[in-house]
């Protein structure tokens, strides 16, 4: 579904200190932007921020960058973080949001700058001619490797079985070792899961969620 253009979104996100307006200028300088030397984790396709806002609250010693394509999405992610701040009565200084096409992500982060990636319910791009747009495709995994630290983990969740099984091959072909995998996350022994908005919706529909952790060798 195509989002309706919200002309008010850009001014609102630019007014927020949670928004990185010129991310390419921060390449190699993200820790300076956060004013600390803590690890930096990415969520690719952060949507409306339900997942990353929980991470930010739970892990104040980790920096987070949430990336999505549209201002119309990021504006709600920023609002979600603000809501969480008001709920816990604490300002989160460990979160930044970026609007960009993830295909150009290596222009935004430098070598060894990122310690973890989360990919949740990304577009499965089922048509073969579109497969290279998948966020887990070897083409993009090669780009991620340009800025990932050694032994970095990528956590991947989806409800799409074809994407999940193809992604296992993508990770293996790209030099990652799959350390944990389940085809039914909510009935697995994995205890560190944080649910996204989509995930909660899918759970009420009785859909199984697939999950894997892949580590860069």
Curated annotation (Swiss-Prot):
Gene: trmB
Function: Catalyzes the formation of N(7)-methylguanine at position 46 (m7G46) in tRNA.
One GO cellular component, as annotated: tRNA methyltransferase complex
Species the sequence originates in: Clostridium botulinum (strain Hall / ATCC 3502 / NCTC 13319 / Type A)
Protein residues bound to S-adenosyl-L-methionine: 43, 68, 101, 123
BP terms from Gene Ontology: RNA (guanine-N7)-methylation; tRNA methylation
Keywords, ordered alphabetically: Methyltransferase, S-adenosyl-L-methionine, Transferase, tRNA processing
Protein name: tRNA (guanine-N(7)-)-methyltransferase
UniProt region (Interaction with RNA), positions on chain: 129-134
Enzyme Commission designation: 2.1.1.33
Pfam families xrefs: Methyltransf_4 (PF02390)
Gene Ontology MF terms in the entry: tRNA (guanine(46)-N7)-methyltransferase activity
